[in-house]
Amino acid sequence: MTNTMNRIVSSNQIPEEYRACRPKFAQLVGRWFLRAFGWKVEGSVPAVSGNENIIIIAGPHTSNWDGVFGFAAILGLDAKITFFGKHSLFGQPVLGRFLTYMGGIPVDKSKPGIGLTEVAIDNMSKLNGSLLVISPEGTRAKTEKLKSGFLRINKAVEGKVFLAAFDFESNRIVLDSFLDLSGDNENDLAYVKEYFTKFKGKRPENY
């Protein structure tokens, strides 16, 4: 049996209903990449009753490297996720195919009346159980206040919010726990903002 203390990443860290069932090779690529850079995934997403929608908020988001290690972890976990990105990225031949393969959905924010929150709610309401990964900061640049979109999405789809973090000081991605929402958006956002201060981003000055 593999010693969990030495484990890099495993599909056992997420419930079976949220697994993508990708080829073993894809999972091995993710694990190899994390191992090559000395990274690992700690913690797990607990099993839930039924196919519930889970909004995973990940931070602190300070660099494009978050996405690099995040995708490697998703492959290693064999996680079936949904995320949203700029439509222009999906127009690039190789990158666009990769993002779509990983569960990405393009969003054209230049169109009137179209926002990430509305697109997320529309897409998640059609899914029978999904892991939506989102950055509550909404940008890699420094911001004083987190965006409340994930709270609005969660309320609309009657899901659960799960905390995850990037820690570049200890080279790990942390799958922590479900967030016990108070119902007061300002208090919940302040709690999440403070929570992420426990971890060191690639560019700490951006958080």
Language-model features: where?
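Extreme N-terminal tail/first-helix region
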Residues: 2-41
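Soluble catalytic domains of membrane acyltransferases
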Residues: 19, 39-198, 203-207
